[in-house]
């Protein structure tokens, strides 16, 4: 084998190892973002909800700062209930559709998928109804979420 071929083979192997170490985005979180966009008709980008209040985003504690933050707290609690049932809410893929009045779960026979889809659809509709207060985005959770 020629040295150039070995270099190409080595480069391919290294790049494959690097790609394997990148964790995949949990499918459910991608679907949840689509449900949010469906519910609010694209009026607010999904990333606005990732660091809002005390509960929107990763984790959560304290008293929710407003109605939207309560939607996130309820969604977190719903995922907690799903986990108690032995479900993996961040990994449960499901079938849904986007109707004129928001997202709906459809054709779901597996209990975990149905439960998680309902959690997400209810939360997405709650997000769409709740006012968004820019002052509650990226807050200091150490002081405001006690």
UniProtKB/Swiss-Prot annotation:
Pfam families cross-referenced by the UniProt entry: Phospholip_A2_1 (PF00068)
Active site: 75, 120
A GO cellular-component term linked to this record: extracellular region
Protein name as annotated: Acidic phospholipase A2 S8-51
Entry binding sites for Ca(2+): 55, 57, 59, 76
Enzyme class: hydrolase
Enzyme Commission code: 3.1.1.4
Primary location class: secreted
Expression across tissues: Expressed by the venom gland.
UniProt keyword Lipid metabolism, yes or no: yes
The family this protein is said to belong to: Belongs to the phospholipase A2 family. Group I subfamily. D49 sub-subfamily.
GO BP of this protein: arachidonate secretion; lipid catabolic process; phospholipid metabolic process
Entry note: cofactor: Binds 1 Ca(2+) ion.
Signal peptide: 1-19
Cofactor(s) this protein cannot do without: Ca(2+)
Calcium is among the record's keywords: yes
């Amino acid at each position: 084998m020629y040295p150039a071929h070995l270099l190409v083979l080595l480069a391919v192997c290294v790049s494959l190892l690097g790609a394997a170490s990148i964790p995949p985005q949990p499918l459910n979180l991608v679907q949840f973002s689509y449900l949010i966009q469906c519910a609010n008709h694209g009026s607010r980008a999904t990333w606005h909800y990732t660091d809002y209040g005390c509960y929107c985003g990763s984790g959560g504690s304290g008293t929710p700062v407003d109605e939207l933050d309560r939607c996130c707290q309820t969604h977190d609690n719903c995922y907690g209930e799903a986990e108690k049932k032995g479900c993996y809410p961040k990994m449960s893929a499901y079938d849904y559709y986007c109707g004129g009045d928001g997202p709906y779960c459809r054709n779901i026979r597996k209990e975990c998928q149905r439960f998680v889809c309902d959690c997400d659809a209810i939360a997405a509709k709650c997000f769409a109804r709740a006012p968004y207060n820019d002052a509650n985005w990226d807050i200091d959770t150490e002081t405001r979420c006690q």
